[in-house]
Structure formats: structure tokens, C-alpha cells
Amino acid sequence: ISRTLTGEYNLSTQLDQEVESLEKSELMQSDIKRVLVHARGCTAARLIQASQEHGLEVVLVQSDPDMESYPAQLLRENDRLVCLGGNTPQESYLNAMSVIRIAEIEGVDAIHPGIGFLSESPQYARICREHGLNFIGPRSDNMDLMGNKSNAINTAKRLKIPVVPGSEGALANSSEASDVAEEIGYPVLIKAAHGGGGKGIAVVEQLGQLEQMFIRMSKEALNAFGNGDLYLEKFIRSLRHLEVQVLRDLQGNSHLLGIRDCSVQRNYQKLIEESAFDLPQKIQGQLFKYSRKLIDEIDYVGAGTVEFIYDLGEQKIYFMEMNTRLQVEHPVSEMVTGVDLVNQQFSVAKGNSLEGLEVRPNGHAMELRINAERVDLDSSGSLRFVPDPGRVTEAYFPAEENIRVIQAVTNGSMVPPFYDSLVAQIIAWGEDRKEAIELLLDYLSRVKIHGISTNLVLAKRILQDQDFQEGNFDTRYLKGLFSRISPQELIKESKLEAGGAANSLDESSVRFENSKEWKILSPQMGGFYRSPSPETPALVEEGSVINLQTPLCLLESMKVFNEISLNSFKTLDGKSLYPEDQQFRITRVLAEDQQTVNQGDLLFVMESITPN
């Protein structure tokens, strides 16, 4: 039932043939007047604005928590907002048949699947077209070949495009993964076959870590993309992450819209994307040659991104994967070429030719991803970034020349804990890289996002860093940056940036007046879990004796589980909120297991059992 609802079921051979025939005829070339936007957050805002500029009526589907979102506020009189129901992705945006039923009821001509969720599901594309809906994206056979990462690698091999050594396809289990890892040698990289955005991906340094990491990444991929398939490849330590933006029509006209560098990453999630710079001519030539060969050989249709690893040590290029959809960072290519990629997606879906499209790259563009996250220290004293959903009390993005903002929040917006943490994309264009960096730094000094914590301060630190400004970095860049900056200063500045000075906690906030009892308040919005799994006992119960390091509960937010202890609570200057030389006894457990709690909700009450 779950696979049916998410569109992950196999259609008959006869139906496949019928749908393929339809894809290559009227359904891929139909006129579009009313489009269903199957997206949320920044992506939904981008697609709504593009659709309206294209003269289309919009039907926006949103989950329960997103019904009052900023994208919903962008709708016009003839547009429609329809509730998908549910909170989690599985209950809402991954429910393919609910989306299609809404599309039929609302009488739309097309569905734009956005960037995440089911945007790379060939089954979803087939079902849409079977129901007479123009799926704004490539043919399903393109997604069969390239949307699945393991299939994409096999396709590249067949076309003699170099790939990183790894598994031939999706891995059946951790035992099979172990065999491949032993053959190519550790360290290895486990990756979601249908993934992206830093989800379902992890480095494994040795055999003892493989089984547990395989299970964990499969669950993470299933939760994020509706498919838990994994593949494995050799991990290259010093690399740049490069990608080519491609666009191709039904008539076979191919366009390459430049190269992007996405090497500034944290936990495989891109933070800064920009126009590629200082690449050897030979490397540029290979990137364009391989990308064009790939999309022409598979008869690709629509917008996509071909991603590569640039091994700095060996000065070699390896194909990594292809995204058969738009990327979050597509505005970088738009800013330097002047080509509106969403507009071109609609044009291709109508059957129009791109033969006359002019692509003339000019200048340098750079994008910052602004995420809802707070920075603090883990038990070892290292910096960590924790999702920080909640209500935005103020959001200010001034309109300025050569700056583009795609935002998902405004004053009063609620950032729910069920999805990714992206709240804004800020893109700058300059005549060169130096000017783009200066523009971004100047602009960030006027941006305000209060009520939630964000990575704005970290973004400023990156842009101010000499190594970044000089282009001396690879995908390990942030690890080096963190060793050069003060963690306490970053934490303090981030809290102030979020407007946290007025709302910071002190000892009086967590003490009951005239009592030896203390409060433990939720540090963030999220799902409250008393134990790591249903099979294990609660971490603490009434009567449990604890200290600052004792795990109390787990809070799940934006697909990340965080262990909470008294040590998780800090004052504005980074000191522990609770006395370090005391022990406490839990006297009351207030929160219910698996319930959603808000920041500041009372979770536990405890009493001190040793003197101050």
C-alpha cells in the first residue's frame, strides 16, 4: 500500500509502452494554462512566481503545517490552495495518488514536481501522463537511466565516461556492500540511489562501521525520498564538486548553460554554489564533452544537471550523478546566462524548440543557502549545527540591484519541524568573483531573520575568509575554517543575529520561585521521543538521578534526531545554564512520547539533590 501511494509500483509492459508512446506525442507537447505546483518552501515560491509570470493559473498543494506558508500567500485570485493533509513527507508530499486526484479535480493541464520529493520518480511521471497530465520534466525512461544514481553510473560506463570505482548498481544489503568495499578499498562513500541534498550519504572508514551505517542511511533515504536503495563508491578526499546545467528539447537541441562549483559543503549539503572559476581549459572541455554526450545519447528532454567529481590530486574528472530535475542552485546559471530555466521547462513541455535560444555566459554569480539552524557545541566541544524550526518574528530582505532572493518565510511564518531547513536563497551577480563576494557581504549586513536561528553568521565568516576569497578550498573547506575561528564567538554572534539577546535564558528562567525544583524546557520545536526506539526503555523516568551529561530524551526536527541533556542548555555567553557540580532527580515527566513540542514547552521537572 505504501509503495502504491508513493507511486513506487511497477506498471505492466503494455502500459509502459502506451505511456512511452504518449510521452513522445501529445502529452509531452500539450498546451498549459493551469499548473499544479507539487512543492513547498523556496521551491514552491520560485515556481509560483514563474508560473504567474508565464500567465498560468496555479494550484498549490500543501501539507497541514504549510497551509499558511509564505508561498501560499503568493497565490492570486484565480489560483487555488489545496490541502494534502498530513505532517510528514510520507503523509503528504510523497503521496502521489493524492496529488494526482487533486490535479484531476482541479482540472490542471500539468504538474510541476519541484525539486525534491517525487521529482525524480519515473513511476510518478508515468502515472501523471497515464492520467492525461503533462509532467514538467524529462521522459520517464530518462529518469530510469539517470534519476537512479546507480543506473546513471552504469549508463556513464557504457558511454565510456570515467566514473569513480564502486558498486555496479543498488546494493541488496550490507553484506554486498562489504564485498564491494573490500574490493575497492576503504574509505568508501554510501549514497542514496534516489537522493540528494546531503540525505542518505555517509563516509565509512572501516569495515566495523559499514553494517550500522548502511542500515541508518537506508532509513534516512527512505524517509527523505520514499526509496531506501543505496549504492557505494570509492571516497576521494581532496575534490571539487562541479556540475553542468543542461537543457534539451524534443527536437534534439542541446544547450549547456555553464559550470557551477558546489564545493563549500557541510555533511554533503551544499551551503554556497557559484559559477566555476580558475578551471584548466582541459577540465572545462571534458565537463562539456561528457555532459553533451550523455544527454544526446539518452535523448534527454528538459532541464537537468550533470554532476562531476574533480580529483584535485590526480587532476581528473569523474562522473558522479545526474539530477533529472532543477537544482536548488539553478539561479546561479540563470544569473550568468539570462536564461529563465523554469520558463524554458514550460516551453519544452509545450513542444517548443530551443533552436534559437542564445546562451552567453557573463560575469560571476554566487548563491547562499540560508537554513534554520542553531550552532552550539557537542559533548566533545566541537561545533554542531542543529535544526531550529519555530516562528519567524521578523524577516527582511531589501530589494537591491544584482541581488536576487527566493524566500520561504516572512514576518510571522512558522518553520515546521517536518522538512528540510532551507528558508531562503540569496544570489548575487558581479562582473567577477570578487565583486559577487563583496555584494553578498554588503547585502547580508542588512538582512534580518529573527525568531529562529540561521546560518547567516557562518555565511558571513565564509565570505570574509581569505582562503575562500582566494579560491583555495575543496569539499573539506569548512573543517579547516572551523579550526581557525572561535566557536564561542560564532555561537554568541549567531544568537544575537537571531534576535536572541532579549529571549536568552538565564538561571531564573528555569528555577521555580522559592523551591529547589528546576524546569527543563524544550530548546526547539520538534518531535519528543523518550527513547531511541520503541523496543528500548525510556532514557529517564520519574525518580531517575541525572547529571549534566545524562541523556534525557531525543528531539526530532527536520529529519535529524538530537540527544538532549542538561549540557545542551547554554546561556548567551556559552556557559552551562545548570550548575555543573550538582546532581538532580527527575520528579515529573510532562511531555508525551512522540508528541510535537514547541520551543519553551516544559518537558521535565527535577530537583537538586546535592548542595550548590
Segments from the language model and where they lie:
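ATP-binding N-terminal substructure of ATP-dependent carboxylate-amine bond-forming enzymes
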Residues: 1-158, 171-179, 598
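ATP-dependent carboxylate activation and anion-phosphoryl transfer catalytic cores
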Residues: 7-26, 30-45, 49-58, 81-83, ...
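Short, ordered loop/turn segments at secondary-structure junctions
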Residues: 40-41, 62-66, 86, 115-116, ...
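Acidic, glycine-rich catalytic/binding loops that coordinate metals and/or anionic ligands
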Residues: 64, 472-483, 487, 595-612
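Hydrophobic, well-structured modules enriched for small/aliphatic residues and gly/pro motifs
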Residues: 93-96, 106-174, 180-210, 216-228, ...
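Short structural boundary motif marking the start of a folded domain
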Residues: 186, 362-366, 516-518, 524
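PDZ/PDZ-like peptide-tail recognition elements
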Residues: 502-521
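Structured functional modules or segments
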Residues: 516-612
